[in-house]
A protein has these predicted regions:
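Compositional signal for N-terminal targeting/processing segments
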Residues: 1-213
Length: 213
């Protein structure tokens, strides 16, 4: 909910952020949910409406709190399909990760466990959902995808990936193995859990004892 996001933002500012040097990008996973057997036109209408309502609601709340979030153009909103155009090698990476999955039994094991953690069956659609989601955020944190932000304008030194919950095992495994041999450009690679307010450093995770839920 937009109201939850505002509360999380208020935790960061001014508690964690004291200088006007940070931008925020909200990414909507609308295209990810097309991995479904539902009719495409029905899904399009459903998620277009959902993204529109959520982003406008969030935009309004950011504006209402402008005394706290003073730099309005530091907040950027984008949909999943926009990210495809931000990495010219995306399709090559996607083909490669699918090939890796077919041959890596440990990767298969972790994605199966992730599906179970989220009360899902690892169908082809669910598998494609996981692989694409993990890959795109991996590419963001590896600097292969630069998220556009009107205020930051490409000057970012690092990106903090935030989500309400623990990262799936398959996502953590992707960083630990670094199949594409991409350099680490950030001091830490991981995910900030908005619920627990703790950062999960993927390179310090023992996946055999780690719990997603």
């Amino acid at each position: 909910k937009p109201s939850n996001i505002i509360q999380w933002l208020k935790y960061f500012s001014p508690n964690k952020i004291s200088a006007p040097k940070v931008g925020v990008n909200f990414i909507y996973g609308d295209f990810l949910y097309l991995f479904s057997n539902e009719k495409a036109s029905k899904l399009k209408n459903k998620f277009t409406e959902m993204v529109w309502q959520h982003s406008n609601g969030l935009h309004d709340l950011v504006f209402r709190n402008r005394n706290l979030f003073q730099i309005q153009n530091a907040f950027s909103y984008m949909t999943w399909n926009q990210m495809y155009l931000l990495c010219r090698q995306y399709h090559t990476y996607l083909k490669k990760i699918k090939s890796i999955y077919k041959n890596d039994k440990i990767f298969q094991k972790y994605l199966k466990e992730d599906a179970k953690s989220f009360d899902k069956k690892l169908t082809k659609n669910q598998l494609d959902f996981f692989l694409e989601e993990h890959l795109l955020f991996y590419l963001v944190l590896k600097g292969q995808i630069k998220l556009p932000n009107e205020y930051i304008q490409g000057r970012e030194k690092w990106a903090l990936f935030c989500y309400p919950g623990n990262a799936p095992k398959g996502f953590v495994y992707l960083f630990q193995k670094n199949f594409f041999k991409l350099p680490q450009i950030q001091p830490y690679e991981g995910q900030y859990n908005l619920e627990t307010k703790k950062f999960i450093d993927f390179h310090n995770v023992d996946l055999e004892t780690y719990s997603v839920k």
